[in-house]
Amino acid sequence: MIEFRDVWFWYQEGKTVLKSISFSFSEGTLAIVGPNGSGKTTLVKMLNGLLKPKKGNVLIDGINTKEVSVAELSRIVGYVFQNPDAMFFEENVFKEVAFGPKNLGLNEEEVKKRVRWALEAVGLRGFENRNPFELSGGEKQRLAIACILAMKPKYLVLDEPNTGLDERGLQDLINVIKNLRREGSSIILVTHDIELVLEVADKVLLLKDGELKFFGSTKEFFELDLEGFGLKEPELVKISKDVGINFVRNVEELLKVIGL
């Protein structure tokens, strides 16, 4: 379980970025949303110890992040950064994904097994000999996820994973997230894309000006006045409300509900 207990953070005195944040999350897909500058990335950097609370505590499965190293936390919390290119340095996809498990001290057979599993999970089987830097934007994003998956962390943080993706890349990402969820991964997703939230999130955490404004189910989130928080309500949600339908995640669900 991830627990934030009255967490405060500031980069310099007089400019508080997070204010008394408290919540707990154990499984599923949690989307963290909010306007620019609301503290989203600051919050998730506390999950693997890149940042430590100035006041309060962050606990990961009972471990206080103030008391352990980033390396120790990385075995529990995997972090995929916004720019996947910054993660790559090997000459091919196989070596890239194998790097993490090798550093965990696993034997060669287990490393190969994890690489195969991770590439299968993100739809990149057959890419083993490809140069990471020659992949498309969506393929690079999926490779970055595979690199972290191969280390088998309990929690996976995706920070703005759909940045720069075209429609096909976004759909591939959605499929990866759904696949990982089916396999039991717990995912923390930071995004500005409210339609992505609608499609994949089980719970939503809303930040504004460093304050926790909402934490609850995706259904409850879309009952809020999103525009009042500087967020755009998806057209699908508007249409659903107009025709008196409670909650659907995509067009296919909407058509099924109305009998088309």
From Swiss-Prot:
Any GO CC annotation of this UniProt entry: ATP-binding cassette (ABC) transporter complex
The entry's keywords: ATP-binding, Cell membrane, Membrane, Nucleotide-binding, Translocase, Transport
InterPro entries: AAA+_ATPase, ABC_transporter-like_ATP-bd, ABC_transporter-like_CS, ABC_transpr_CbiO/EcfA_su, Co_trans_ATP-bd, ECF_ABC_transporter_ATP-bd, P-loop_NTPase
Task of the protein: Probably part of an ABC transporter complex. Responsible for energy coupling to the transport system.
Domain of life: Archaea
Gene3D superfamilies reported in the protein's UniProt record: P-loop containing nucleotide triphosphate hydrolases
ATP-binding as UniProt keyword: yes
Binding residues annotated for ATP, in chain numbering: G34, P35, N36, G37, S38, G39, K40, T41
Family listed: Belongs to the ABC transporter superfamily.
Protein name: Putative ABC transporter ATP-binding protein PH0132
SUPFAM superfamilies: P-loop containing nucleoside triphosphate hydrolases
UniProt membrane topology term: Peripheral membrane protein
Any one Pfam family match given in the protein's UniProt record, by short name: ABC_tran
GO biological process per UniProt: cobalt ion transport
One MF annotation (Gene Ontology) recorded for this entry: ATPase-coupled transmembrane transporter activity
Protein EC: 7.-.-.-
Start and end residues of each ABC transporter domain: 2-234
Localization annotation: Cell membrane
Position of the signal peptide: none
